[in-house]
């Protein structure tokens, strides 16, 4: 499927070496002031060629807003947009036309469709995430009107991880000091050095993104099959190279129930919890506490080290991947994680509004 969401719905299109990447966003409420600077900022964070930590493919990534906006505000009509591709080197991929790259989508796409665009991965390329980031910026505009914030940061690269695992305690100011958006100066330096070394070795490395959502009201999310954490997991795991997701205390099963349970108390204004092991979600519905989750991204599959594989006839071949590739999904994936979280929450917002009690 190329469409995500129920009421706040994105349909995306485009390939890595096609004419462009774009989308149609349907369900965005009318009257929302369009923040063009926010869209540019989010695209810039995702844009290739911005630092030594990323690919040197150089794209301007300027968005054309085609419909759904009048006099600086959304009209309620579908918002169509396009970001044109300008720096493609398709010839770098000609030798791969009949070869399946290890751990890429080449084999599965070919097996499923009988045809595939071999240029830069085609539709399976992470360049597709441009559409998510643009749509996510509109979702953020909606959430900003309710003082809801979303912030992702780097919490691990390879074996180097933050010691503080409580995502809600990190410093935005410290994170803003480095390209990785890591809230620990020492760890950030070590992480960047590791990525640089891996890049020099023509290899790649994986990492973990932590994300915090603040300001959510109580009551967003649906019971049973539409649980908020399940929809977040679906959204985040749809991002290329994402291999794992946990929210709240997640896989930390060493504690007993008496330690994990979040005790309720009344703070004089509203019901609160003394801890937040639940990650801001209980029964699939937001409880008013910060929502936090972590997502693991595998090492980028495109590496220049020689590898063994087969062609579409099954003959064994040895390849050395050319082209321009990131040594690590982080930090460029951070705005994509935020965008997907924003799309889920904007959709949850509209669903909650549609079910507000009238008696």
What is each residue range found by the language model?
Residues 1-57:
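N-terminal, positively charged regions that mediate nucleic acid binding
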Residues 9, 300-359:
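Internal helix-turn-beta structural module
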Residues 9-14, 117-128, 218-220, 276-281, ...:
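A short glycine/serine-rich beta->alpha loop
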Residues 13-19, 202-205, 209-316:
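Glycine-rich anion/phosphate-binding loop at the beta-strand->alpha-helix junction
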Residues 19-31, 127-148, 226-234, 289-291, ...:
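Alpha-helical support elements that line or immediately flank enzyme active sites
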Residues 43-102, 106:
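Glycine-rich, N-terminal phosphate-binding loop and its surrounding beta-alpha-beta segment
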Residues 97-122, 307-325:
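Short acidic, glycine/tyrosine-flanked loop/strand segments centered on an H-E-D-like triad
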Residues 112-224:
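Glycine-rich, mobile lid/loop segments that gate access to catalytic sites or pores
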């Amino acid at each position: 499927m190329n469409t995500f969401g129920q009421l706040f719905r994105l349909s995306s299109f485009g390939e890595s070496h096609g004419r462009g990447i774009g989308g149609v966003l349907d369900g965005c409420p009318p009257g929302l002031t369009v923040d063009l600077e926010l869209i540019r900022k989010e695209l810039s964070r995702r844009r290739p060629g911005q630092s030594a930590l990323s690919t040197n493919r150089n794209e301007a990534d300027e968005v054309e807003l085609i419909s759904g906006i009048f006099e600086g505000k959304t009209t309620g009509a579908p918002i169509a947009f396009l970001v044109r591709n300008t720096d493609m080197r398709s010839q770098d991929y000609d030798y791969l036309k009949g070869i399946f790259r290890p751990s890429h989508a080449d084999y599965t796409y070919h097996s499923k469709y009988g045809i595939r665009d071999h240029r830069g991965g085609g539709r399976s390329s992470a360049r597709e995430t441009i559409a998510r980031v643009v749509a996510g910026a509109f979702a953020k505009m909606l959430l900003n009107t309710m003082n809801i914030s979303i912030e992702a940061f780097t919490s691990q690269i390879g074996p180097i991880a933050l010691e503080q695992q409580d995502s809600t305690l990190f410093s935005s100011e410290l994170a803003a000091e480095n390209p990785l958006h890591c809230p620990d100066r020492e760890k950030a330096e070590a992480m960047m050095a590791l990525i640089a070394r891996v890049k020099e070795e023509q290899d790649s490395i994986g990492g973990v993104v932590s994300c915090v959502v603040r300001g959510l009201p109580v009551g967003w999310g649906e019971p049973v099959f539409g649980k908020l954490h399940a929809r977040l997991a679906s959204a985040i795991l749809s991002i290329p190279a994402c291999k794992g997701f946990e929210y709240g205390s997640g896989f930390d099963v060493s504690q007993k129930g008496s330690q994990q349970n979040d005790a309720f108390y009344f703070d004089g204004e509203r019901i609160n919890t003394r801890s937040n092991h639940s990650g801001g979600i209980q029964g699939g519905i937001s409880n008013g506490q910060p929502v936090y989750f972590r997502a693991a991204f595998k090492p980028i599959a495109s590496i220049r080290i020689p590898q063994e594989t087969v062609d579409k006839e099954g003959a064994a071949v040895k390849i050395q991947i050319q082209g321009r590739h990131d040594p690590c999904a982080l930090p460029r994936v951070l705005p994509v994680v935020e965008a997907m979280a924003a799309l889920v929450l904007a959709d949850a917002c509209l669903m909650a509004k549609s079910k507000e009690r009238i008696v």
